[in-house]
């Protein structure tokens, strides 16, 4: 296990730098490394690491979502509120619907399986979007119109839509009797509950940090542990109505930055450093899940489905921003 982590870290740093030198995204290098050393490649990652791969990827995602929350500003959110709401569901629904129909006609998939495929592909990856948007914010690009904040906010809610619709199709596939209306109603409720829980948790942590004077590193660890507990809680809930834990995580960071700005700025710097390691783990382990033979077998038709999805997502983005100044 220790050797596997060493290979992931050293290889990830090397491939990240190499792809940067080629003017390609560094994350592509890390994904390529994962494919190369994963179980479908050279098989250099131990079974122990692969067994906890899902948990490691979740922790990495939590780290970048906390950092995203620490990068949001209330004034900007108010300014782009309406556009963010439309952008959070229209592009994803259009993309998912287009991919679903295309998969039915091209791959002759049953409707339920096509729907599952569609909303796996349509889900936005915060781990890709968030670092790029934070980089734009730090470099003061798009700040006047709030474009990075708009995308940050929309991407997190987009995921809730995609996951909920995917889980609905998955339930049908498993033969479960699912109330579609209740599932759809759960989307806005889970988002609102996620925000509420995030605000309450953020305020509670602020009060705790103000009373217990500890090093910022310990505050980061406590914040990370609380965020992990929230995601575990959501996964284990069996109630009809749930909450969006990833939005809660993001909201905690936002609340700390708004209510305790000095601490928020210090924590943001800490999470930037933590993300360097988390990013390596996340993208290399994602790459390790890729069966390159299956991907190659999809060939041109697989590429066509993705292309059609992106075209309809672009149409959704355009519709969402009609009437705005963007």
Predicted regions and their residues:
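Transmembrane helical cores of multi-pass secondary ion antiporters/exchangers
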Residues: 1-326
